[in-house]
Amino acid sequence: MTRSVRIAAAGDVHACEPLRDHLARSFASAAERSQLVLLAGDLTTHGLPDQAEVLAEVCGDLPVPIVAVLGNHDHHSGCAAEVRAALEDGGIRVLERDHTIVEVDGVEVGVVGTKGFVGGFPGAEIPDFGERALREVYRETTLEVEALERGLEAISGCHKCVVLLHYAPTQETLVGEPEPIWAFLGSGRLAAPIGMHRPDAVFHGHAHRGTARGTIGPVPVHNVAVHVTGQDFALFEV
């Protein structure tokens, strides 16, 4: 039987200079207690490169692999490419519609990472119909779904398979948020490849007032936004 892997996960850390010391302490503690760190988007406050540099400098000397996806805050200032570059300079592996395989004490952990996007959930979903702008939103989510499908297929031979998102793939982890805004917090379309491939776990953030745990079929889905978990990092055995 394959050994479990200790994962520390957090979303919505919103790095900026005033939080530098707090982030340094929290990331050092996470590295001591885990074998892999996952960051579920909104890594910066407003998507500025200097904010990303704060996080990169905090993470630069940590002894564990760190894998991340960007969130909506990281795109806000139109500098997502620079934010990603700054993070990767600090040794953070940033996934955008991509996957990576991390070896942890002989265990291959496949991570599929993509931001996800909006669109709503069954019964209240944005359709692929109407104005071009609306259909572009639908298309953007389609690209995210296709990336999940490709990535999950690519890591299917790994000992452990996890999905890392920012937006929610299920309504279950949105409970606590006002229902009228659920369409802006995630998309049920993201659930299809997850339900088909059945990874060991899914991690996301974004929904600050949501619920910590849900499921897609038998797959556990964890909302690791720090506002939900109430801690700097939540720890998981996968």
Language model regions located:
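Active-site neighborhood of phospho(di)ester-bond hydrolases with catalytic His/Asp-centered motifs
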Residues: 9-11, 37-42, 66-72, 93-98, ...
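Active-site environment of divalent metal-dependent phosphoester hydrolases
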Residues: 14-19, 44-49, 73-83, 101-104, ...
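A short, N-terminal amphipathic alpha-helix
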Residues: 32-36, 150-154, 192
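Conserved catalytic scaffold of divalent metal-dependent phosphoesterases
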Residues: 13-15, 81-184, 225-226
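Short, structured coil segments at secondary-structure junctions
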Residues: 62, 90, 216-219
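N-terminal active-site segment of His-dependent metallophosphoesterases
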Residues: 1-65, 75-78, 134, 138, ...
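Charged helix-capping and loop-helix junction motifs
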Residues: 24-25, 50-56, 82-86, 180-189
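Binuclear metal-dependent phosphoesterase catalytic core
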Residues: 1-4, 81, 102-105, 175, ...
